[in-house]
Each structure stands twice: as C-alpha cells, then as structure tokens.
C-alpha cells in the first residue's frame, strides 16, 4: 500500500504512523472478541529502537519493549478514542527516563548475586517459564522497522520489502521502501478475521490495499 496515503490518514487523526496502525490493530482485535473476552485489556507489545535515546554503533538488536494497553469502556470500539489512548501510552512510556528505568530493572536482575549463582540447569527453565507468563498477558505485537534505504544502483531492481517473524499469536511487522509500505502478518491461527478487519478498515478509509497470502482460501 502507498505509505503516503497511510501517513496522510495518520496526520488527519493527529497521530504518528505507528500510533495510527496500532489503533487500527486494537479495533480489529476488539471487533473479533466475544463479550467475555472484551472484559480483559488488549495489550499490544511494541519494540522500541533504543538508538534514538542512547546512541550506539552496535549492529546487534538494540531495543526494549513497551506495552500499549486498551480497555474498552463502551460497547463499541471508537477509533478516535483508541487513538487518544494509544498516543497517551506512547507519550508516557517513550521518554528517556522511563526507558532507562526498564533497562535498569533488567540489569538489576541480571547482576543480582543470588541469580548469578543459580545453576544454568535451573536458571534456563525458570527464565523460560517467566517469559511464558509474561507473554501470556500480551494480545498481539506490532513492530515498525521504519524506512529501508538501499543504494540507488540496487534500488531500481527491488519492488518492495516484507518482514515476517515467528509468532505464537497474531503479530504484524511493517517497513517502508520508497512509497511502498508493506505489513507482514504471521501467526499460528488459520482464522484471519482480525487481519481482514485491519485491512478492510484501511481500505474503507481510502487506502489502496493489496493482499498477498499463502492461504489459498483467504479472501478479503
């Protein structure tokens, strides 16, 4: 889809590119939840590039994660209301002090002398179980890799980029190349109603959406 169209809609809704798309994802999840499921908060896991806060030359992944949480207080999911709450979550969490606090928390655990003396035979299962418990709270994940720049000599031979990652639950990764914006969706569920709602909402707003799927019976 054209990134310029999505960016225009985001600005019209007084949101950033990522905030706008996360709001769309939250509404799409809400639309496909039962009345009982809607009592629980929707939590979107969002990786944050730490280089914008702490300059680093490392080529390794340098990120932390924030959680965007939404609990509906109405019978219907109001898109404008969701955007406001997503913006508040970003504004409150995307600060250097908060990010530093997240890093410090993990650093304290890693350097705890009690934790360090625990044998790996015990430590690894405990860490995996802790990760499992933390992951269970998340509803979905959304990662925006941003704009991909390629040398002009090679760019003319590339049509677009897509990103896919292994995921236990619906997860979206997106990136932009030129004016082409691609969203890679992955998950273990065959039911794609959440994705249908997500892209249909964009299409209803006037975005020219093209779907490419490896599911032969997937229809939009």
Where are these regions (language model features)?
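Acyl activation and transfer enzymes in specialized metabolism, enriched
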Residues: 1-34, 183-185, 192-195
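Acyl-thioester-dependent acyl-group transfer interface
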Residues: 30-220
């Amino acid at each position: 889809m054209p990134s310029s169209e999505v960016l225009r809609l985001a600005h019209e809704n007084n949101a950033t590119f990522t905030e706008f798309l996360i709001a769309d994802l939250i509404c799409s999840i809400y639309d496909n939840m039962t009345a009982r499921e809607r009592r629980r908060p929707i939590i979107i896991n969002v990786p944050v590039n730490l280089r914008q806060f702490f300059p680093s030359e490392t080529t390794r992944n340098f990120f932390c994660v924030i959680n965007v949480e939404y609990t509906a207080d109405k019978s219907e999911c109001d898109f404008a209301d969701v955007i406001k709450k997503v913006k508040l979550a970003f504004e409150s969490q995307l600060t250097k002090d908060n990010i530093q606090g997240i890093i410090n928390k993990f650093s304290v655990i890693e350097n705890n002398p009690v934790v360090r003396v625990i044998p790996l035979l015990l430590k690894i299962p405990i860490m995996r179980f802790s990760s499992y418990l933390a992951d269970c709270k998340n509803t979905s994940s959304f990662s925006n890799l941003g704009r991909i720049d390629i040398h002009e000599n090679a760019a003319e031979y590339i049509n677009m980029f897509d990103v896919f990652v292994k995921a236990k639950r619906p997860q979206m990764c997106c990136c932009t190349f030129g004016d082409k914006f691609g969203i890679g969706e992955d998950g273990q569920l065959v039911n794609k109603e959440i994705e249908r709602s997500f892209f249909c909402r964009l299409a209803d707003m006037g975005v020219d959406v093209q779907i490419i799927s490896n599911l032969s019976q997937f229809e939009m």
